[in-house]
Amino acid sequence: MLDIVELSRLQFALTAMYHFLFVPLTLGMAFLLAIMETVYVLSGKQIYKDMTKFWGKLFGINFALGVATGLTMEFQFGTNWSYYSHYVGDIFGAPLAIEGLMAFFLESTFVGLFFFGWDRLGKVQHMCVTWLVALGSNLSALWILVANGWMQNPIASDFNFETMRMEMVSFSELVLNPVAQVKFVHTVASGYVTGAMFILGISAWYMLKGRDFAFAKRSFAIAASFGMAAVLSVIVLGDESGYEMGDVQKTKLAAIEAEWETQPAPAAFTLFGIPDQEEETNKFAIQIPYALGIIATRSVDTPVIGLKELMVQHEERIRNGMKAYSLLEQLRSGSTDQAVRDQFNSMKKDLGYGLLLKRYTPNVADATEAQIQQATKDSIPRVAPLYFAFRIMVACGFLLLAIIALSFWSVIRNRIGEKKWLLRAALYGIPLPWIAVEAGWFVAEYGRQPWAIGEVLPTAVANSSLTAGDLIFSMVLICGLYTLFLVAELFLMFKFARLGPSSLKTGRYHFEQSSTTTQPAR
């Protein structure tokens, strides 16, 4: 049976994965709606207004359910991860509060104006509202990813032994954290690809069915053009993310690449292999010479540190952490010796490694050799899940590049809809961005283990004092509710996608033309 920590992790993972089924589509469709409405305002063509209103229906369904699934996640920090909230709440809470007060209210206010302001606002005013919806959704992502980036790379903070908490020392440094910035642009770009692929695939289906061709063709063209820029951005920014990972998250990088030994620079990239955690080796490997070293370090003479060497470093830091913990106990018991304080300040960077021993003993300073060795093994994540999830993400990314690039080529050649196989590829490719983003988030979060806050707070000591029954009950309840939300989303999405622009009831589209003489929009 899973223990309390594992159950808490599982619950958060499930709610986060459910929530992130909705987030990328919101990010991507918001900008696509803004682009469509801008074309409408500039050209005056009714069809672009119809496109904005129809795709806006699907955006609205997704937005509402995304908000609903996101609410419980923040509450979990207090209910399931109370020590985490106590230990780092002053830092982690700041960007989340800003997101709620500024970005979310901006987004939600203007979403209402987007849907109900068509007959109350001028064309330019409504277009500005749509752009503000897009801006608000991206600002929400920015502040959430600033918080998440700090969990990965906890700069701009310092441990205060008097309060037993991490405290912020520089807000600007927190916001400009390079890991947070790279995660932000990579994540929102993946959302843009998701939105583009969603519209591309449904538009392709309309053309395959021979209906609403003018509407579908224009939607396809905008989605392919926007998607082309987005998918190239995702790949470039993914490379930048790998470079940052090699700089500040060496353990995660080595685990993703199943890099057990430190290879001579530049390291080879393992295209495919079978990692064996127990033997600390790969049973089978197909490698591309020099590729990993060049991608991860952007040099030919800097090595990528292997997991075995990293574990040696971690063992040393665990032993230093034991000393830091012993000094902390002296300070907490009232010692005023300046030498003790100075020594603690010089060693507190390794205190988190000492806390890895809390899983095995309450008295960290007196841990046995066997416990130290076990904590050292715990200092790296499970390799195989990360290794394969990363490759699934990359494979989906390059499949998306191929589909979107071919679609964009058909747009610039003015041959949209001529290749039935391409339309089918666009339709069947709709799930690919979701697979990629879910795999990517798994890599980001699972790869940080065993840390809740990188090298500061182990996951094993960050949880609340709940019972297994509490967690199982709440998990079943939340996941059951989220499953109902997902079913509702799929039902409504399929319903309105099948109706297409006929759902606008303008009399201009497929299901209405048999009973009206109104001409199709142009």
Swiss-Prot record:
The induction annotation reads: Under conditions of low aeration, in stationary phase (at protein level).
Source organism of the structure? Escherichia coli (strain K12)
**Which Gene Ontology BP annotations are present?**
aerobic electron transport chain; oxidative phosphorylation
Q: Which family does it belong to?
A: Belongs to the cytochrome ubiquinol oxidase subunit 1 family.
**GO molecular function terms listed in the Swiss-Prot or TrEMBL record:** electron transfer activity; heme binding; metal ion binding; oxidoreductase activity, acting on diphenols and related substances as donors; oxidoreductase activity, acting on diphenols and related substances as donors, oxygen as acceptor
**Keyword terms:** Cell inner membrane, Cell membrane, Electron transport, Formylation, Heme, Iron, Membrane, Metal-binding, Translocase, Transmembrane, Transmembrane helix, Transport
Gene Ontology annotations for the cellular component aspect, listed alphabetically: cytochrome complex; membrane; plasma membrane
Modes of activity regulation: 90% inhibited by cyanide and 2-heptyl-4-hydroxyquinoline N-oxide, at 1 mM and 40 uM respectively.
Chain positions recorded as heme b b558 binding sites: H186, M393
Q: What is the lineage of its organism?
A: Bacteria, Pseudomonadati, Pseudomonadota, Gammaproteobacteria, Enterobacterales
Q: Which residues are involved in binding heme b b595?
A: H19
User: Null mutant: what phenotype?
Assistant: A double cydA/cydB deletion shows increased sensitivity to reductant (beta-mercapoethanol).
Where found, per UniProt? Cell inner membrane
Cofactors needed by this protein, per the record, are: heme b; heme d cis-diol
Periplasmic topological domain:
1-15, 70-96, 147-186, 236-390, 442-472
Quaternary state and interactors: Heterodimer of subunits I and II. Probably interacts with CydX, and overexpressed AppX.
Alphabetical list of Pfam families matching this protein: Cyt_bd_oxida_I
Q: What is its EC number?
A: 7.1.1.7
Known post-translational modifications?
A: 86% of isolated protein was N-formylated.
Note on cofactor = Binds 1 protoheme IX center (heme b558) per subunit.
Q: Which gene is the coding source of this polypeptide chain? A: cydA
What is catalyzed by this enzyme? 2 a ubiquinol + O2(in) + 4 H(+)(in) = 2 a ubiquinone + 2 H2O(in) + 4 H(+)(out)
This chain belongs to the protein called: Cytochrome bd-I ubiquinol oxidase subunit 1
Its biological function? A terminal oxidase that produces a proton motive force by the vectorial transfer of protons across the inner membrane. It is the component of the aerobic respiratory chain of E.coli that predominates when cells are grown at low aeration. Generates a proton motive force using protons and electrons from opposite sides of the membrane to generate H(2)O, transferring 1 proton/electron.
